[in-house]
């Protein structure tokens, strides 16, 4: 009698596929929030597996701040065509004009928190009752305590004190009219799990995840790449370094890490040796306050 056992990556994959199928069963109008980063790319791969041989039964939604890395945008468009998925793109720039919002000021003027308004408007426009995201619990303490099925009220707000139990992988997606649920199929994955899975499954990624040369300036110990949105001050020293990105956000709030890792194996070896989380090492917007992420999520952020 033969025994069938899953390794840990196969167990994580099976859990995520189960969550995707729960979404399809429980919600009428789900959507997958897609940024062109490694986590949302992994979500698309898992969604294809969950519904194969059919197409992904919901659209990919990208909230474009206008400050995205060009490599991520090019990859987004290519992947949407490759998997034959509907791609919905909404611009933060339009929201700023329509709502007369104030643009962030300062040296690194991140539109990250303004994405919330565009996301909530998009949910209202398409009547989405579920938005699937690529957040993981190892990234940040606010995400660590959020459920896989995270209920948002009619204003898109999250109350961490009112979360539903998820015993025995039973997920409750029942909501009142106007509410919606954010679902995180890879909550239990780590950054290392994601990279090992990408290597095993031979998943394509944007080139910025691997070592390349960029002009950067140093800000509070972080390397911020120069671009049309990030310009040096007179006292900044411009450096040219070999860097890669651990996470992909806006160019104005995402720092690079110094690296020579040009292959998947080399990236994985670097991750194994690091003791700093990807957001802790690279996200400027998370350092605004101690509870920056939780505050954004309470107001409707991803």
Question: Where are these predicted regions, by residue range?
Answer:
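Nucleotide-activated chemistry modules centered on ATP-dependent adenylation/adenylyltransferase
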Residues: 1-302
């Amino acid at each position: 009698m033969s025994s069938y056992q899953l390794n840990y990556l196969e167990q994580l994959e099976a859990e995520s596929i189960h969550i995707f199928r729960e979404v399809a069963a429980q919600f009428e109008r789900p959507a997958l929030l897609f940024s062109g980063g490694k986590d949302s790319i992994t979500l698309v791969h898992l969604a294809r597996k969950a519904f194969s041989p059919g197409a992904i039964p919901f659209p990919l939604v990208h909230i474009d701040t206008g400050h995205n890395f060009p490599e991520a945008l090019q990859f987004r468009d290519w992947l949407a065509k490759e998997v034959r998925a509907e791609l919905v793109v909404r611009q933060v720039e339009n929201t700023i004009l329509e709502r007369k919002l104030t643009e962030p000021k300062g040296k690194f003027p991140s539109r990250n928190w303004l994405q919330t308004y565009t996301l909530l408007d998009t949910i209202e426009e398409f009547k989405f009752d579920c938005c699937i995201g690529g957040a993981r619990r190892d990234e940040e303490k606010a995400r660590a305590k959020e459920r896989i099925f995270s209920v948002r009220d009619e204003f898109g707000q999250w109350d961490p004190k009112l979360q539903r139990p998820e015993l025995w992988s039973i997920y409750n997606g029942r909501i009142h009219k106007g509410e919606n649920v954010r679902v995180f199929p890879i909550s239990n994955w780590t950054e290392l799990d994601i990279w090992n899975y990408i290597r095993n499954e031979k998943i394509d990624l944007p080139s910025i995840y691997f070592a390349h040369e960029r002009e950067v300036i140093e800000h509070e110990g972080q390397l911020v790449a120069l671009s049309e949105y990030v310009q040096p001050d007179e006292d900044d020293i411009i450096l040219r370094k070999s860097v890669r990105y651990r996470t992909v956000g806006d160019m104005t709030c995402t720092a690079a890490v110094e690296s020579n890792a040009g292959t998947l194996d080399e990236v994985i070896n670097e991750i194994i040796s690091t003791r700093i989380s990807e957001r802790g090492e690279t996200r400027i917007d998370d350092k605004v306050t101690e509870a920056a992420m939780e505050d954004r999520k309470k107001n409707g952020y991803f």
